[in-house]
């Protein structure tokens, strides 16, 4: 993460400088936990804003830096306000949360969602620069769910001379995904739930299909029940064919009112009650043991006071 002052003929409106290789030699490792946190942050904000199209989230990225090696391990959300049509970060909130929750991590930079860098990003980047001389900027594009490539771009800033004025320019930095054991398990679970290349969740699709099937079954059963009630009250004619089919349908239901079923059910029910009872006894014993320990410690302190007196 470096700020390099160079003279360039870059257009003043261009905020990103495309490069084929990383000129600074920075090696960035990105953990999936960061992407999961950002995705969760964006999803919650999107739902709370009633799915507005201009939804955007901002936060900071944390990790460890050792020379030119940077490992982005975690992230958290940022509180900000709009002052004179500009975003202003709550630096006091950043300082308190950073010191209390993540004392072992370095503040490496910040993140946001979007597809293009704007001038507001330059201003936010300068605010983060008060805590890190050359922070990284991670952008997650939430508008490209069908993209096969990971929609994540990491920028570092360089200071260029544009039209004889120093200008901050973002430069794309290559990165690689680094996963821990816990992250690997979580990512594998998500991959099983959401098939690759699909916008929806496999679990959601399954539940939606099941909901439709149960709703349809409920409608049909209610219609049959209403018909039988109407026949019973002699509001509809007595149709042998329909009643025969209804009786056949009821006979297809499994009959579980047997001695073996009741015995198995009662045995399992008693096992559950026994486990619950043992858990309650264990919890009570632990509480009693803790109370006894506190009493012994208190009694020992009082004995020492009387001895020294």
Curated annotation (Swiss-Prot):
Coiled coil: none annotated. Its main location: cytoplasm. The keyword Cytoplasm applies. Component of the COP9 signalosome complex (CSN), a complex involved in various cellular and developmental processes. The CSN complex is an essential regulator of the ubiquitin (Ubl) conjugation pathway by mediating the deneddylation of the cullin subunits of E3 ligase complexes, leading to modify the Ubl ligase activity. Component of the CSN complex. The holocomplex is comprised of 8 subunits csn1-8. In the complex, it probably interacts directly with csn2, csn5 and csn7. Belongs to the peptidase M67A family. CSN6 subfamily. This is COP9 signalosome complex subunit 6. It comes from Dictyostelium discoideum. The gene is csn6.
């Amino acid at each position: 993460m470096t700020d390099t002052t160079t003279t360039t003929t870059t257009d003043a409106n261009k905020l990103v400088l495309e490069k084929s290789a990383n000129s600074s030699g920075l090696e960035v490792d990105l953990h999936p936990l960061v992407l999961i946190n950002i995705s969760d942050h964006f999803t919650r904000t999107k739902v709370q804003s009633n799915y507005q199209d201009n939804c955007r989230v901002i936060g900071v990225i944390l990790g460890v830096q050792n020379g030119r090696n940077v490992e982005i391990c975690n992230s958290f959300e940022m509180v900000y306000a709009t002052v004179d049509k500009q975003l202003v970060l709550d630096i006091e909130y950043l300082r308190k949360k950073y010191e209390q929750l993540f004392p072992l991590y370095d503040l490496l930079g910040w993140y946001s969602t979007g597809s293009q860098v704007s001038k507001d990003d330059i201003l936010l980047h300068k605010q983060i620069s008060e805590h890190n001389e050359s922070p990284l900027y991670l952008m997650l594009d939430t508008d490209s769910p069908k993209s096969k490539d990971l929609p994540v771009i990491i920028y570092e800033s360089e200071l260029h001379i544009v039209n004889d004025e120093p200008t901050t320019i973002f430069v794309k930095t290559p990165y690689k995904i680094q996963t821990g054991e816990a992250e690997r398990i979580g990512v594998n679970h998500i991959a099983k739930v959401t098939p690759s290349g699909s916008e929806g969740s496999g679990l959601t699709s399954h539940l939606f299909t099941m909901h439709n099937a149960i709703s349809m079954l409920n409608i049909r059963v209610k219609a049959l029940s209403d018909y039988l009630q109407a026949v019973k009250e002699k509001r509809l004619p007595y149709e042998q064919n329909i009643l025969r089919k209804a009786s056949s349908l009821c006979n297809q239901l499994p009959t579980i009112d047997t001695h073996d079923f009741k015995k198995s059910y009662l045995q399992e029910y008693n096992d559950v009650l026994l486990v619950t009872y043992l858990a309650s006894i264990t919890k009570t014993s632990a509480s009693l043991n803790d109370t006894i320990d506190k009493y012994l410690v208190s009694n020992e302190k009082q004995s020492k006071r009387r001895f020294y007196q």
